[in-house]
Design a protein with these regions (language model features):
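Short beta-strand/loop motif that positions the catalytic acidic residue
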Residues: 210, 216-218
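Conserved alpha/beta-hydrolase catalytic His-Asp/Glu region
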Residues: 153-206
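Active-site loop/oxyanion-hole signature of alpha/beta-hydrolase fold enzymes
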Residues: 59-99
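Conserved HGGG/HGGXW glycine-rich cap/lid loop of the alpha/beta-hydrolase fold
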Residues: 15-69
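Catalytic histidine-centered segment of alpha/beta-hydrolase-like enzymes
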Residues: 247-260
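Flexible "cap/lid" loop of the alpha/beta hydrolase fold
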Residues: 109, 113, 119-149
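Gly/Ala-rich beta-loop-alpha elbow adjacent to hydrolase catalytic centers
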Residues: 100, 104, 108
Length: 270
């Protein structure tokens, strides 16, 4: 059995990080998951459960979120990627496959381009190119600048249909239950640090330089990151393919049974 998950805290450059590792099988490249804004590593548990048990899975809470304490000072994507590289070294990994969702997709792009030795293959889910992208509506963006949805379940149930799209339109209670049962929100300042980390950042200039095999995944009903962004990234990244699923921004969680095999097939391909 490969299902046991080890959760522990490690120190990387003076920063404590909460890390979870699900052991896999030798011969397969481990998979690093980078989560979206405000969400702890626990949120992606449904996706991890659907992945082939042979895949070793690494998750972590970014500083100031979940079980990782606030950093001493704010950070940018460059500093966070250095921290991720240090975390991988501390855990004994040289190279991994990388999956980033939403905000974490921006971090994953930065890591793959500027620390290429760390990334073998790249999976970008429900994400975009940063400051220069096809934006969400102003009403959606206004709801994203605050962590209130993680703190107030009734508020989340009310806004989930318009914020996340997909199955959240018909079953917002399921989304609320998932996020409030397994997400551990850090301080409000930690959420703001995440917002600030990507302010002004864009991957548009360097995506044509990305030489990693890349799978771009997007839902056809994602109010936060419109599908046009996935099509743009697929066009810009030389060795990429696009997978469009029927669902919304949280498809990796709500449609995990469909999407996990797609990811696994891409990572296992020759």
């Amino acid at each position: 059995m490969f299902s046991t998950v080890e959760v522990r805290s490690i120190a990387v450059g003076g920063q404590q990080l909460r890390v979870a590792v699900r052991p896999g099988r030798r011969g397969r490249v481990p998979l690093l998951l980078i989560n979206g804004i405000g969400a702890s590593l626990d949120l992606l548990q449904p996706f991890v459960d659907e992945l082939a048990p042979s895949v070793e899975v690494i998750r972590f809470d970014v500083p100031g979120v979940g079980g990782s304490p606030l950093p001493v000072v704010p950070y940018r994507f460059t500093g966070l990627c250095r921290m991720i590289s240090g975390m991988l070294s501390e855990l004994g990994y040289a190279s991994v496959d990388v999956l980033g969702i939403s905000w974490g997709g921006g971090v994953a792009q930065h890591l793959a381009v500027f620390q290429p030795s760390r990334c073998r293959r790249l999976v970008l889910v429900s994400t975009g190119t940063g400051a220069l992208m096809v934006p969400a509506s102003p009403a959606i963006l206004a709801r994203m600048i605050t962590p209130r949805r993680y703190l107030d379940r009734r508020y989340l149930e009310r806004i989930a249909p318009i914020l996340y799209g997909g199955s959240a339109r018909t079953d917002p209670q399921r989304v609320a239950s998932t996020m409030h049962d397994v997400s551990r929100l850090g301080s409000g300042r930690g959420y703001l640090y995440q917002l600030a980390a990507g302010t002004g950042w864009t991957s548009l200039p360097f995506l044509p330089l990305l030489r990693k095999p890349t799978l771009v995944m997007s839902g056809d009903d994602d109010p936060i990151i419109p599908l046009a962004n996935a099509r743009l990234m697929n066009w810009l990244i030389p060795d990429s393919r696009l997978y469009v699923y029927h669902g919304g921004h949280l498809g990796l969680v709500t449609e995990a049974a469909e999407l996990a095999p797609v990811v696994d097939s891409f990572l296992a391909a020759p």
